[in-house]
Amino acid sequence: MTSSDVRDVLNLGDGTVGPRSSKKQKLAAPRPNLKGLAREVQNLGGDNPIAIVPEVTHFKKRRFTSRKPTAKWEMRPFKNSARSDSNFTLRHWRRKDEKQEGIDESQEQISQGDQPQPQKNELEDSAFAKYNVQVSVPQYSEGQYQQSLQHVDWTKEETDYLLELAQDFDLRWPLIWDRYEWNPPATNGEADDDGDESKAIVPATRSRTLEDLKARYYEVASKMMAAQKPVQYMTQPEFSLHELMAHFNPQQEKLRKEFALNALTRSREEAREEESLLLEIKRILARSERFNDERRELYNRLDYPRSDTDINAFKSSAGLQNLLQNLVTADKTKKRKSLMPGDVNSPAGTVPPQTAAAASAAATAAAVAQEAGRRESTAASTGPRESTGPAPTPAAANNKKGQQQQQERRKLTTQEELLYGVTHHDRLGSGPTFRTEKINKLFSHKSNQQQMRITNVLNELDVPNKLIMPTAATTHQYEQLLAAVNSLLDARKVSDKLDQEIKTEQAKKAERQKAMAPPEAESTAENGQTGQEKKDGDDGEACAAAVTADTSKEETNGDATSAAGDATKDGLETAVLTSEAPDAPPKETEQNIDERPGSSGAPHKRSASVLSNVSDKSNKRQKK
């Protein structure tokens, strides 16, 4: 598409004012006529030809354009600090910088002045001395060896020889075992007259294995490590190293090497046999899960709870047939799943029993009860039909729920909980809590009187109300102490109540005995009557005083009953009336006589009637 076509599409006029200029003529330069390889190289460039810049050659061009002087080198001596011979000196080439040396010398002279210059003949150390790492072997004294390092098969000289080899060869055990040549020194015998000791005893040499050398070295190292720093003060890496060396087992190391050697030297047939055994083991492991499930199902079938029903129903042929039909029906219903005690439901869906055995026993008992007057075959045919009817919807729903539920866990007994350390803690609320809050709740739930009683008991035991250091163990013991104190106070409360009831009944008994006693003769002198009335009044006052003492004790404990309190109040009123008018008869004597029981028809004296009135009022109030 040309420019004129574009202008026609865009409805633009011709932009040319004058005549169009003619095209410039291309001046085609003569192309070189190349042939062969030069032509192919020229064509590789395409439209952009390769520019070939001619190289300007110079005659006898200088090789090095730098005008710097050549570096100077010198032979410097040095030493190697890793070597034991300090006088051994070596030499190597080092670059010498004259300018830098001149500047350093001038600066040192200016800064130091008249100070003595350091020695120039000090030798530099080798750069490879830092790679010579010395192994630290355990060191011990004669006393330490005699105390903790003695061994039956090892002497001190041989142990020293082993440690020297370990230090020389940097604990490279193959080299140590290869260079280990211990010859025990000869023991001289008795000398002859001429002084000849030809009867010297040379002990036999003993060959040491690599594991024996390791075991002896690790034993010495672990014991000396524990002697220098106790085990309880070691860090975690030090303790791990100590445990590794102290529990080195040479026999296990030998077995490991033998196993590795046998694995490397086995033949192809043995390798194939081992591979086949490994494949068989994998198959066994793959089938083990299914085998375990079947075994668990069998155990569940055998480990059923004992039934309390009578087994006489299963002694007949009809009972056995009915039992077999029930078991088959239960298996079909559960689709060959495990018959757990909580998962088995009754096929009829009426009353689900606990186990399949119980269900079959109940169904069989019902069938045996219905077969009275029938033949055994009829009972055997009708019994299973009644128990194997179609299950309604509720039974199916219960079966599904039972399948979804997990297996119930067996509850542990008290002995098993103590054996396994099972504890039951209180449920904690949200947010942080303190142990002291739990103790404060034990006090806050009590009344003021009970809190005072608990505080008094704790003061008697010299136990503070608030714990100084409420740790978990201390808090637990404190809770047990408070529980024991509460039990003690409850027992005291019940004891006081029983004592008060016993005293009340004793007073009633004494009153009844006085009522049933025969009346005295009317010819008794008036002075005698007066003395008797005074004596009775004294008895009434003593009884009232006893009741008053009981009342004060009951007020202190705060646990007296309403009946006892009423009796005490009546006793106090009676004591006041008796003390005010001991000789005057009371106004309500006739009324009191009417209120007496039918057995007390004889006349009584003033003190007896008053006590009878008190006891009757207390009985009425107790009835109310």
Curated annotation (Swiss-Prot):
Q: Where are the annotated segments for Disordered?
A: 1-34, 96-120, 334-411, 504-624
Q: Which InterPro entries match?
A: DAMP1_SANT-like, Swc4/Dmap1
Q: Transmembrane segments in this chain: where?
A: none
Q: Where is the composition biased (Basic and acidic residues)?
A: 504-514, 585-597
Q: Where in the cell is it found?
A: Nucleus
At the top level, the lineage of the source is Eukaryota
Q: What is known about its subunit structure?
A: Component of the SWR1 chromatin-remodeling complex and of the NuA4 histone acetyltransferase complex.
The molecule here is called SWR1-complex protein 4
Species name: Gibberella zeae (strain ATCC MYA-4620 / CBS 123657 / FGSC 9075 / NRRL 31084 / PH-1) (Wheat head blight fungus)
Q: Which gene encodes it?
A: SWC4
